[in-house]
From Swiss-Prot:
Function statement: Catalyzes the ATP-dependent conversion of 7-carboxy-7-deazaguanine (CDG) to 7-cyano-7-deazaguanine (preQ(0)).
Alphabetical GO biological process terms: queuosine biosynthetic process
Catalytic activity: 7-carboxy-7-deazaguanine + NH4(+) + ATP = 7-cyano-7-deazaguanine + ADP + phosphate + H2O + H(+)
Pathway this chain belongs to: Purine metabolism; 7-cyano-7-deazaguanine biosynthesis
Similarity remark: Belongs to the QueC family.
CDD domains: QueC-like
Record keyword Disulfide bond present: no
Keywords annotated in UniProt: ATP-binding, Ligase, Metal-binding, Nucleotide-binding, Queuosine biosynthesis, Zinc
Gene that specifies this protein: queC
InterPro entries named among the record's database cross-references: QueC, Rossmann-like_a/b/a_fold
Descriptive protein name: 7-cyano-7-deazaguanine synthase
Catalytic activity, EC: 6.3.4.20
Amino acid sequence: MTNTALPTSSADQENDTQLNELHKSQNAVVLLSGGLDSVTCLYWAKARYASVTAVSFDYGQRHNSELIAAKAIAETAGVNHRIIDIDIAQLGGSSLTDHSMIVPDGDTDKFPDKKRDEIDNDAIPNTYVPARNTIFLSYALAVAEVTDSNHIVIGVSSVDYSGYPDCRPEYIAAFQHMANLATKAGVTGHHLSIQTPLQQLSKAKTIELGLSLGVDYGQTISCYQADANGFACGVCDSCALRRQGFAQAGVADPTHYQS
């Protein structure tokens, strides 16, 4: 697992340079939802790896206009793109897949001092999709094996988050350990890593990173209940974090809002 920590010595800088050179000969799989974080990860991976495959999921989400965004983003970036069908919606348990449930309004101040290791059940919103990241990463792991990729890139963060347990560093570390125990690649010495370049970045810092890499955030859809045209509701948790991020970064928000 990796983060965005900077090297602290000349030896660290030399090791970092050698690692970057190694990565340029390797391939990566990027989980691409069509949102702000995942497109930043896509461009981050493009700058580091020889070949990148983007993977998106049609899982019965109410905001499936994000898949249209993901397709356009992948085409703009010039990367291979796979959309995988998984019917998670039949399981229920989330307002993102169950239309009888209400998507709550966002509140960026609801966890001002709470760290990820202090998350409790009351802090997990109903937009959490049961086991979603585990399911997505498992499919990405299979794609990594068939595309001879050493890395899977996912846009989880420990700074700006919605209280999801499957975005924590310890979860990512555990999945990476499992991946190297449970795959042909892992047991034959081809180490698989889960890369989390946004893990320690706020939404504002993520936006700054993306802009430095050439990301067009006008293509992205973050909203949990975007309409068929991709217009965002402006009030859900994801919209609240996105609005806050652009404001803190001092950058104009290119999002099309419903009102």
